[in-house]
A protein has these predicted regions:
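Conserved phosphate/pyrophosphate-binding and hydrolysis machinery centered on Walker-type P-loop NTPases
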Residues: 1, 83-86, 143
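Alpha-helical phosphate/pyrophosphate-handling elements in metalloenzyme active cores
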Residues: 1-22
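Active-site hotspot residues in diverse enzymes, especially metal/ion-binding acidic/histidine motifs
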Residues: 6-11, 145-162
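Divalent metal-dependent catalytic cores for phosphoryl transfer on phosphate-bearing substrates
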Residues: 15-124, 136
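C-terminal binding/interaction regions
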Residues: 125-149, 164-167
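Long, low-complexity, intrinsically disordered segments
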Residues: 182-193
Length: 193
């Protein structure tokens, strides 16, 4: 979720939008996922609808709520606002970029480039949980090329590598420390980066 926040902030700056509200949308878009994980067999998915229902009772801005609902196809909520389009566009891509970094010997997002992400996109066995069609459709929805989209999100993640735990291995071969405690993961990917 932190990677999605970083990417959303980058797009907000680029598009002249409110950086804080866009960042918050990225940060909270999956806040209810652990409580309501997606079940491929279920006809009615609770994530993100249950979380949005709760936030609505607390008076959260409708633009953020609509973006959160729109990032999941199965909600049927159209992505009308730029915020909603951007959230959909960056969600899967941040997971793919995270996976690309974690398979590097250095475990550093600084060692990932656009060409490498494009190459890994073609490998369906790599980061299987990442929906490549969503990545492509997201760039199209924003009216930019796929390479430009990857470049924007990658640059945002590289600029925030330390807080994302993607700054690489320390000289001793250990995962880098994340500010506030803990270490960066050395293998695997999160469900949503």
């Amino acid at each position: 979720m932190l990677a999605v926040e970083c990417a959303m902030r980058a797009y907000a700056e680029r598009l002249g939008q409110d950086v804080e509200s866009w960042g918050v949308a990225g940060l909270i878009h999956d806040f209810d996922y652990e409580r309501y994980p997606n079940d491929a067999q279920a006809a009615d998915q609770e994530h993100p609808a249950e979380g949005v229902r709760h936030l609505r009772t607390l008076g959260w801005p409708e633009e953020i709520l609509e973006a959160v609902l729109g990032h999941a196809h199965y909600t049927g909520v159209p992505r009308v606002s730029l915020m909603a389009k951007a959230l959909f566009a960056v969600d899967e891509l941040t997971g793919l970029i995270t996976a690309c970094a974690l398979v590097k010997p250095s475990k550093a997002v600084a060692d990932v480039d656009v060409a490498g992400v494009r190459k890994k996109m073609k490998d369906k066995a790599f980061a299987r949980g990442v929906n490549r069609d969503d990545v492509i459709q997201g760039a199209e929805a924003l009216g930019i090329s796929l390479d430009e989209h990857i470049g924007i999100v990658l640059a945002a993640m590289q600029a925030n590598a330390q807080s994302l735990g993607l700054s690489g291995l320390s000289p001793g071969g250990h995962a880098s420390e994340i500010p506030g405690g803990g270490t960066a993961p050395s293998t695997g990917t999160s469900p949503d980066a």
